[in-house]
Amino acid sequence: MPKMKTKSGAAKRFLKTATGFKHKHAFKSHILTKMSTKRKRQLRGSSLLHPSDVAKVARMLRVR
């Protein structure tokens, strides 16, 4: 049986850390003129994945 491949799209978007999976915020790429400065500031940086999604992402990345 060959090795299972990781989902390359998920590998580009998520990073495994000691406390969970790190990811960037969505809705921050283009057409930002309509968005308020406060909202753009809140979407800056990265955050940890919600606990309910951890199992799905771990399966996609083949992480135990």
Swiss-Prot record:
Molecular-function GO term, any one = structural constituent of ribosome
* Keywords, ordered alphabetically: Ribonucleoprotein, Ribosomal protein
CC per GO annotation:
cytosolic large ribosomal subunit
Alphabetical list of Pfam families matching this protein = Ribosomal_L35p (PF01632)
Q: Does the keyword DNA-binding apply?
A: no
Set out the biological process GO terms recorded for this chain's protein: translation
Record HAMAP family:
Ribosomal_bL35
Which protein family is named in the record? Belongs to the bacterial ribosomal protein bL35 family.
Q: Which PANTHER family does the record associate with it?
A: 54S RIBOSOMAL PROTEIN BL35M, LARGE RIBOSOMAL SUBUNIT PROTEIN BL35M
**The protein, known as:** Large ribosomal subunit protein bL35
Query: What is the organism field in this record?
Result: Pseudomonas putida (strain W619)
The gene behind this protein is rpmI
